[in-house]
């Protein structure tokens, strides 16, 4: 598989959740970081699937190697659904409720649209997060 094919699969899938991958300014499909622009650089070659990151100060983040296409796509989708669901959670904040409740709910909804394997894997990731950092709901202040 080529980097171009990887991008096309991600682009096509993400259209189903209303995301235009060309508008995401922190994900690139290229083997080399362009001018050290901050973001994640995904690429594929005959040996597998990879991601190299560039930090906001130009620091190169070590390369990740994925076992297969599904792992690479999950990494992409996990990040993009974070962006979308965080925006959703901010706009739909409920006083006294941990903001992660609507974020995780929206994120799982998006992953479900992308496919059951991504949804199930996302559920496991969220369970790990909540095991170490449970929801912190508070009572709204009474006036």
Regions found by a protein language model. Give the residues of each.
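Intrinsically disordered, low-complexity, charge-dense segments enriched in Lys/Arg
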Residues: 11, 86-143
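A short, charged, amphipathic alpha-helix used as a generic interaction element across diverse proteins
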Residues: 67-80
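N-terminal "first-domain core" detector
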Residues: 1-41
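Amphipathic alpha-helical interaction segments
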Residues: 62, 79-87
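Short aromatic-glycine-(Arg/Gly/Cys) micro-motifs in beta-strand/loop hairpins
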Residues: 31-61
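Short coil/turn segments at secondary-structure boundaries
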Residues: 60-64, 68
């Amino acid at each position: 598989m080529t980097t171009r094919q990887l991008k096309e699969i991600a682009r096509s899938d993400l259209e189903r959740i209303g995301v235009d991958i060309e508008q995401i300014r922190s994900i690139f499909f290229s083997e080399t970081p362009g001018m050290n622009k901050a973001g994640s650089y995904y690429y594929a070659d005959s040996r597998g699937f990879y991601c190299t990151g560039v930090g906001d100060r130009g620091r190169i983040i070590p390369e990740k190697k994925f076992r297969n296409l599904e792992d690479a796509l999950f990494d992409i989708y996990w990040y993009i659904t974070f962006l979308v669901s965080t925006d959703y959670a901010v706009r739909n904040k409920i006083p006294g409720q941990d903001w992660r409740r609507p974020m995780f709910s929206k994120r799982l909804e998006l992953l479900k649209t992308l496919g059951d394997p991504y949804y199930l894997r996302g559920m496991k990731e969220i369970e790990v997060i909540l095991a170490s950092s449970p929801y912190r709901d508070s009572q709204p202040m009474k006036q």
